[in-house]
């Protein structure tokens, strides 16, 4: 496959996995409320006085991302192991974003454009590019589309009382 060609099927599959993994914690919180809501950082604070990650990063959300991604993969005829790795990498990118934002002194659920979407999308797309048949252009397009989805859909989800913030 030429680097200049865009494989829209692979991009759509990857975008579906990204949306699935990243919406799973939000939807699960909406369904379960505070039940089974244990923070990944176990309330750990670092020497800067800020939490390692914060209350919004939970084991429930992490496992929900894996579960929703596997369901999505099965619907797309992808291997469940790819979906599992994808979700773990996406959530690792999300945790990295939260860690960086806490070190910047930003409160939980604060918005930092780019930092909120790039690590959680770049990490799985880049590390699983062969398994997902993505080239550099496909990865760039997918990240751009994911960013646009987040920017356009988040305010709507906020108005529908699904998200706590409009971003």
Labelled PLM ranges:
Residues 1-84, 91, 95-127, 133-167:
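Interhelical loop and helix-boundary elements at the membrane-water interface
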């Amino acid at each position: 496959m030429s680097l200049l060609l865009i494989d829209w099927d692979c991009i759509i599959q990857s975008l579906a996995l990204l949306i699935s993994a990243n919406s799973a914690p939000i939807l699960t919180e909406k369904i379960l409320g505070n039940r089974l809501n244990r923070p990944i950082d176990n309330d750990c604070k670092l020497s800067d006085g800020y939490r390692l990650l914060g209350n919004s990063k939970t084991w429930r959300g992490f496992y929900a991302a894996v579960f929703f991604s596997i369901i999505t993969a099965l619907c797309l005829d992808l291997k469940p192991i790819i979906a599992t790795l994808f979700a773990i990498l996406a959530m690792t990118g999300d945790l990295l974003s939260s860690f960086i934002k806490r070190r910047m002194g930003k409160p939980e659920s604060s918005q930092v454009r780019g930092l909120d979407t790039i690590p959680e999308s770049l990490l799985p797309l880049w590390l699983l590019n062969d398994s997902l048949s993505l080239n550099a252009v496909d990865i760039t397009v997918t990240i751009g589309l994911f960013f646009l989805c987040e920017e356009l859909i988040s305010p709507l989800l906020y108005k529908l009382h699904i998200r706590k913030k409009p971003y």
